[in-house]
Amino acid sequence: MIIKRDYYLKKIIDKRENGRIKIITGIRRCGKSYLLFNLYQEYLLSKGVKENQIISIALDEIDNLEYRNPFRLNEYIKEKTKNRNQIYYIFIDEIQLSVAVSNPYIDSKEENVTFVDVLLGLMKRSNLDIYVTGSNSKMLSSDVLTQFRDRGDEIHVNPLSFAEVYDLYENKELAFEHYNVYGGMPYIYSLKSDEEKAQYLKDLFKKTYIKDILERNNKIGRAHV
């Protein structure tokens, strides 16, 4: 199933190669990764960009755990983008999973190295066009703008609008009925039964959103949710 997200795709396209870090934010499971790794990547390929010019790193994959370390992430990207005469598109998914590590030169927690330091350094290279996705309590809009010191462009993605869901259905009355009941989380529209859809939303709310809200407000830790 292909879900068109033309409104957000255009926003990304308009910011292509603008010398700034593109930060795609939004609640979990709203379609950020699909927008970047599917729709935008397909757009770039259709415009003549070669596959080896797109460097994709998903930090939620077990094979990429080492790149949650900012130093390893920096090394990996530099290794993959040695040709300074070629434009590279850097896609990093779930950037909030990156961890702060000690600065080997300064013994102070206030000087810990984070993904922000890495990205701000990489953006100075004129042949890199950087895009990241981030969700949960660590990536609120106010935090993003503060962390990137006005060197990033935020693209905030919402769940599917009714217009986007409408295009998925031949039976337009059914489209309205389903959207009215289940809302706009994209994965819902790949599930067949009402039971599956209801359970998915219940799990998403309990296991994901409640955790983020509580952690953001320092109420309880993960183990007690």
Give, region by region, the residue ranges found by the protein language model.
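Short regulatory helix/loop adjacent to the ATP-binding pocket of P-loop NTPases
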Residues: 137-153, 169-170
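Conserved lysine of the Walker
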Residues: 32-33
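Short glycine-rich substrate-engagement loop in P-loop NTPases that contacts/grips substrate
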Residues: 55-86
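Conserved Walker B catalytic segment
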Residues: 91, 96-131
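Pre-Walker A adenine-sensing motif
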Residues: 2-19
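Interdomain hinge/linker elements that couple catalytic modules in large macromolecular machines
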Residues: 156-224
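Hydrophobic anchor at the beta1->P-loop junction of P-loop NTPases
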Residues: 24
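P-loop (Walker A) phosphate-binding loop of NTP-binding proteins
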Residues: 27
